[in-house]
């Protein structure tokens, strides 16, 4: 198969994925004696196209499953997508708004048709992106969180938890999103520090004798106040407990009550109680049987309980209310106050604590079981392990989960209310006399169905499902650390509750993809990167390798075009190395021609030893998910050892007349390159398939080739040490040539003073390598080499490498040249020092610019020290 002179990812990747899918290479094995390995894809939302975070996520999953397939496992990498209730509904509503239509204009049924159309459109985009990334998914098993099978699972779980008393319906303070008009769970609320105000008001005593000072950050809620509370141990208020105050504006009389919840040292020590608009106030209200007065509607506008402010937006009401209180001389002071305010993770709206009747999951027992399970043999291993502590902490402090959402797109709650009696019926099927019942209009939190993903996608609740019996529990979950609470924790407690087993063995957590400057990627900053654009420019293999090897587990990844380009250069290096190897191997060379039992050269033994070391390292690190370290091991072996050294060394026998030695070299080239392709394949599936198909091979595809194994018979420690000595000598000679400004093309005398006779013999036996790579006019290897007075000497493991300088360079001229270079470097150092000592520059310049100047200083200093040392050496 022809390989073009330059690596072209478009040509390499064209049609390859379709061929893999068509031939069923990603389907599980038919050999049921094999051990299974399963990963279910974290389902991307059908809200839009995939971003770099998705690309990172799925690349890691694909690397793991491809590797496990090659290691002989029966692998299943199961695809699917999430309906993403609130996010998708918002997108569809925005699209309708462009046409001047609301969801209420359409009605529920027609709106859901629009949502399904949206889903189909974006699902096709997502599949196309999966294909471009090269993901080895079994599309015959693709699932969607609203498909029939998953809907059945959701209903069963809801009904079972309801019957156990774990799911309940109750009136509680919930997080209300007035923009999306739905309840939110605690972890869907993002807390942001904002500049606000602390308002101090007078609440006059009903008897006309003075006032009590009350402070609040949300004046609009005072319209729903039903009491004032003070700490019973607060001496300031002991005499007023039992008295009443008049609620400003409204005129309602409020009792002053004693409650130990109040912090004596905070504010005035007196606190207003608004049970319908604050979770702590609600608890106080329950203790004192206070009335719950809701003063806002679901849109965040003031309702009829707000009196003259009815119909006003809550924030407009705040301004007007403060203005009115000032006019009545009831404002004591207004202080600037920097505080944390909850915002909707989806809509960005300021979240309103709001009294509402919702459905909840009682979390105490579910959380305890998850925590207890981590102390058993069925525990889940977290990578990095520190995230287990994060998981445990959250589970230990968990609150009940609000699961109802005031949306249309999602799993409608399987609860019905009798039209006459109000009786509640919860069941997997609708009541038989459906005409007498009204189904709850709310849907379930998206994460409720996502929490069942590892087992619902495999056929549960059908316990006899072949997929469920064979592929559950799954082996690894790969996802971002930002959804440990949203998703990972919930899958764990639901998996334990409904299957009595952990849903996955390992959890591999990665960070966020950030812009090059470390900032979060976002539309508003305009610094987002479309992974498909990167693939169009550099190829899927370049992007995959960068994503997989660019950081360590649990850490964020800074996207860098320069680094992706450097991966492209690495692949191009591999490509060129493969082209050279294939040209020398020849088209007639077959797998059966590979013979490594012949007369292996030192270079052959060395590269085979390094190959086996790399196989062992890559396998071990991959099992620990240390793909960053894997990347370094592969890069060092392929770029340095194979391409830069072995390929060059192989030219010695290939350019000789020794046919037997040529055949041995062909075998080593073929064997080594084949193993390199198989090690690289999970990371770079496209280019490795292309090169592997050109190599002598067995089988139809590298996808199903076996993972490389260490062969003890091909490890030659002594040869490795000898080659290390030779390489060190060659590097020393080349560095010395640079330092005395003598090109490699010019022959020079080289002396090697061997440390002992054994080394002298070894180096003499392998002097062909030194001659090829050092280009000596004469080469003298001996233990008793006489070192000339004027010479450049380097100490190496094998002894000393000496370059006689007499006649090689004009000493005075070279010293003069170096002194001029030293002066230039001193000038640059002075310039950078002046800049970095300038307080004005340091205080105003961006951190990136300052760091760049520091880097320059370090570079100049290293060069300065090197040039100065060379001058001193020449003068000596």
From Swiss-Prot:
Record-linked Pfam families: Anticodon_1, tRNA-synt_1, Val_tRNA-synt_C
GO CC annotations on file: cytosol
Subcellular location: Cytoplasm
Superkingdom per UniProt: Bacteria
Any GO BP annotation: valyl-tRNA aminoacylation
The keyword Disulfide bond appears for this protein: no
Coiled-coil intervals, chain numbering: 805-876
Major enzyme class: ligase
Cell inner membrane is among the record's keywords: no
Residues reported to bind ATP: 523
Stored PROSITE patterns: AA_TRNA_LIGASE_I (PS00178)
Known EC number: 6.1.1.9
Motif 'HIGH' region boundaries: 44-54
SUPFAM superfamilies: Anticodon-binding domain of a subclass of class I aminoacyl-tRNA synthetases (SSF47323), Nucleotidylyl transferase (SSF52374), tRNA-binding arm (SSF46589), ValRS/IleRS/LeuRS editing domain (SSF50677)
UniProt GO MF annotations: aminoacyl-tRNA deacylase activity; ATP binding; valine-tRNA ligase activity
Keywords: Aminoacyl-tRNA synthetase, ATP-binding, Coiled coil, Cytoplasm, Ligase, Nucleotide-binding, Protein biosynthesis
Segments carrying motif 'KMSKS' region: 520-524
InterPro entries according to UniProt: aa-tRNA-synth_I_CS, aa-tRNA-synth_Ia, Anticodon_Ia_Val, M/V/L/I-tRNA-synth_anticd-bd, Rossmann-like_a/b/a_fold, tRNA-bd_arm, tRNAsynth_Ia_anticodon-bd, Val-tRNA_synth_C_sf
Regions that span the bilayer: none
Domain free text: ValRS has two distinct active sites: one for aminoacylation and one for editing. The misactivated threonine is translocated from the active site to the editing site. The C-terminal coiled-coil domain is crucial for aminoacylation activity.
Function noted in UniProt: Catalyzes the attachment of valine to tRNA(Val). As ValRS can inadvertently accommodate and process structurally similar amino acids such as threonine, to avoid such errors, it has a 'posttransfer' editing activity that hydrolyzes mischarged Thr-tRNA(Val) in a tRNA-dependent manner.
Record's subunit section: Monomer.
Family per record: Belongs to the class-I aminoacyl-tRNA synthetase family. ValS type 1 subfamily.
Protein name stated in the entry: Valine--tRNA ligase
Organism: Staphylococcus aureus (strain Mu3 / ATCC 700698)
